[in-house]
Amino acid sequence: MSVSAAVAAASTSRTLVLARRRSPPASRVAATSRGRPFSSGPHPLAVSPATRAPAMATDCAAAAAAAGSKKKKEVLIFDAEEDLAVSLAKYTAELSAKLAAERGAFTVVLSGGSLIKNIRKLAEPPYLDSVDWSKWHVFWVDERVVPKDHEDSNYKLALDGFLSKVPIPTGQVYAINDALSAEGAADDYETCLKQLVKNGVIAMSQSTGFPRFDVMLLGMGPDGHIASLFPGHPLVNENKKWVTYIKDSPKPPPERITFTFPVINSSAYVAMVVTGAGKAGAVQKALSDKQTSSDLLPVEMAVLQDGEFTWFTDKPAVSMLQNK
């Protein structure tokens, strides 16, 4: 269903914080972006052998960096992708229960790529039966401007790997209008979001004036890009629009729509899910304190104004960080 067709069906209210419950014991690693020594102890969230590390990052605008805005991020490191998937499902299900009860709706933003495989445990017991899927409203942080049944479509990827396996109402899944141009699809998606804010389905950030999604489940490319915001591309500096478009993506297909950083950074929760040695360089840079505002990777520009940011990683992804 396109966004314009889906908005009419929607209506509800607001957001608060997750009281995190302690999970079964797991290993813990304490570190910061300044490279403090590692230590061990209990882990508050992961259900499997994992490590935890608060880290620092720089805000997305040079002005914020100049103001010395360094926000804490939590880093969870898992021995295996299976363990990561179990913990990510638990994290998302707990947020769903908490925020759906408080707001009457749960707004979830997905990315493409391996993220859909990583959330597969949500479509299995116990979550398949225990999650209130009727409260879910699903969006995409970016989308390729291709038909919905095209192999490059993030919608198709999510439909095949996740959405077809859980009972989320069709009218609460907000795909782009694939009959429009990239510019038209971006404008249409932003119009949809504004209507859903007006209806109370999506909260509005009081501090930023941008929509405040309950949780964004995001991935990162080996070059440090998130959404369709690529290193060195002018779109990383867009600070007015909610949704914009790109026609010269360095990664095919070239035409896409994407949320902007003000929207990403207004989220209540972000889970950055990154696995594999191929992304270790970008992870090391993102969690280092040596960056300057002139050489930030897009992933470093994801700094929540008033929310909680958690990295879900495996050991290969943080191998350069641990060896530092």
UniProtKB/Swiss-Prot annotation:
Pathway: Carbohydrate degradation; pentose phosphate pathway; D-ribulose 5-phosphate from D-glucose 6-phosphate (oxidative stage): step 2/3
Catalytic activity entry: 6-phospho-D-glucono-1,5-lactone + H2O = 6-phospho-D-gluconate + H(+)
NCBIfam families, per the entry: pgl
GO molecular function: 6-phosphogluconolactonase activity
E.C. number(s) listed in UniProt: 3.1.1.31
GO biological process: carbohydrate metabolic process; pentose-phosphate shunt
Transit peptide: first to last position: 1-61
Positions with biased composition (Low complexity): 24-34
UniProt-recorded name of the protein: Probable 6-phosphogluconolactonase 4, chloroplastic
Subcellular location per the Swiss-Prot or TrEMBL entry: Plastid, Chloroplast
UniProt KW Hydrolase keyword: yes
The keyword Hydrolase is annotated on this UniProt entry: yes
Entry keyword set: Chloroplast, Hydrolase, Plastid, Transit peptide
PANTHER family, sorted: 6-PHOSPHOGLUCONOLACTONASE, 6-PHOSPHOGLUCONOLACTONASE 3, CHLOROPLASTIC
Pfam families according to UniProt: Glucosamine_iso (PF01182)
